[in-house]
Design a protein with these regions (language model features):
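C-terminal alpha-helical interaction modules of replication/initiation AAA+ assemblies
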Residues: 5-137
């Protein structure tokens, strides 16, 4: 990731009076999807390439039964997502490792807890979170 651009975007967001919770929620949702993509890629069921995600229908055939009853769109179920969106989210660059994605999810949780404790320091909390997530990427 681009730490400088991320920090600048956070500054713009909070300059206009933004709140941290929607950012954290969006990051958690996207990260949940990437965790599932990474697990499927590591299992050899999908491949992230220049045209998005290849093999998603095959992976769905293998694992959709694990999500019985989960038919509404949700970041908890990769197979309810628009395949085009998943491909764009995964991008054509190398996916982060599963460990990095899990660590990021933990950082998002820590940041959410911190903004509850320090509601007037939301920008600083997200800035610190971004540094922790992107500096080690």
């Amino acid at each position: 990731g681009d730490l400088t651009a991320t920090l600048a975007a956070l500054q713009r967001h909070f300059f206009t009076g933004g709140d941290a919770r929607p950012i954290i929620a969006a990051l958690q949702n996207r990260n949940r999807i990437l965790l599932q993509v990474r697990a499927l890629a590591d299992a050899g069921l999908v491949r992230v390439g220049p045209r998005g995600l290849d093999g998603l229908p095959r992976a769905q055939g293998a694992y959709a039964s694990r999500f019985i009853g989960a038919t509404e769109k949700s970041s908890f179920n990769l197979f309810t997502q628009n395949p085009w969106y998943v491909g764009k989210l995964a991008g054509s660059a190398k996916l982060p490792t599963l460990r990095r994605l899990i660590d990021n999810q933990q950082e998002f949780l820590v940041a959410f807890e911190e903004i509850i404790q320090r509601p007037h320091e939301q920008e600083a909390v997200l800035r610190d979170m971004a540094v922790r997530c992107l500096a080690s990427a």
